[in-house]
Amino acid sequence: MFKVLVINPGSTSTKVALYEDEKEIVRSDITHDVETLKNYKSVIEQLDLRLEAINKWLSENGIKVLELSAIVVRGGLIKPVQSGTYVVNDIMLEDLRKGVGGEHPSNLGGIIGRALADPYGIPVYTLDPVAVDEMEDVARISGLPELPRKSQSHALNIKACIHRYARENNLKEEELNMIVAHMGGGISVAAIKGGRIVDVNNANQMGPFSPERTGSLPSMKVVEMCYSGKYTLEEMKKKIVGMGGLVAHLGTNDAREVVKRIEAGDKKAKLVFEAMAYQIAKEIGRMAAVLKGDVKTIILTGGLAYSKPLIEIIIDMVGFIAPITLYPGGDEMEALRDGALRVLRGQETPKIYG
């Protein structure tokens, strides 16, 4: 029997779970107060806060790190890699600390995992990190050669959805063309060709705005803001990732609260909420063009897929493209667990980063 601890840092929470083989023993979603997170200038500064919360959770649940077979974490913005399971080695750890691929809560996963595991010599793995890159060359070109488009997405859940759909429908992944829209604190809309993510908006910088990210912005106006003298570099980064989207417009990243406001007659909340759904649907349409209309299904997943009002707007706009499949929430925890178990059972050889 293998004991596996799974750690999945998100924008405003850290999901943790203990498994004995495939059996879930305990699972929690440790929520971090938005106002508290605002006090941190960067994601890396949240390390002690999140590590303390996890240690408290471990203690409350009587979990001893020494008894674990492995820790597996959600991967962060490292250098571009192929899909698969990786050892969180020193090279990856350094790149996560530096944020070589950018700022993202998942950068903390490997750092937290190693902080817990190193005193006991326990292996730490990551699976299908945000930096998974399968984009076609034509999708990388932007209007400036200095600024190529990069593949950064919620690859873990996107890949889990591909695996699940293929399994449930008795289909081969390499024969599947589909669109997967992961909708959470950040939003990734991916074109899947032959099971590969051939194009995707960069959830930190492009595409639809989300509960706390701006998505694509009018570039000239962004330049003007940067040179206005009103904002530092870090303040501008925070505006785009962390303080954008619903947070910027409505002061909350909770779509459920926004829906309550709408039901209470808040017209601004209604307009902003509909705009977010509109932009998600528009991005799905863009990805349908990438696949030349050959779309088996459109999968809507992530926490926002629980929002019936949001889903209704999206389906109304893109239902003509392909049948809609709903996988609300995400299979990220199970996907991470399964990756670690495959390695522990000798079914897969972990890849080495760097």
Curated annotation (Swiss-Prot):
CDD domains: ASKHA_NBD_BK (cd24011). GO terms for cellular component: cytoplasm. Keywords: ATP-binding, Cytoplasm, Kinase, Nucleotide-binding, Transferase. Pfam families: Acetate_kinase (PF00871). GO terms for biological process: acetate metabolic process. It comes from Caldanaerobacter subterraneus subsp. tengcongensis (strain DSM 15242 / JCM 11007 / NBRC 100824 / MB4). Signal peptide: none annotated. It comes from the Bacteria. It catalyses: butanoate + ATP = butanoyl phosphate + ADP. This is Probable butyrate kinase 2. Its EC number is 2.7.2.7. GO terms for molecular function: acetate kinase activity; ATP binding; butyrate kinase activity. It is found in: Cytoplasm. SUPFAM superfamilies: Actin-like ATPase domain. Belongs to the acetokinase family. Its main location: cytoplasm. Coiled coil: none annotated.
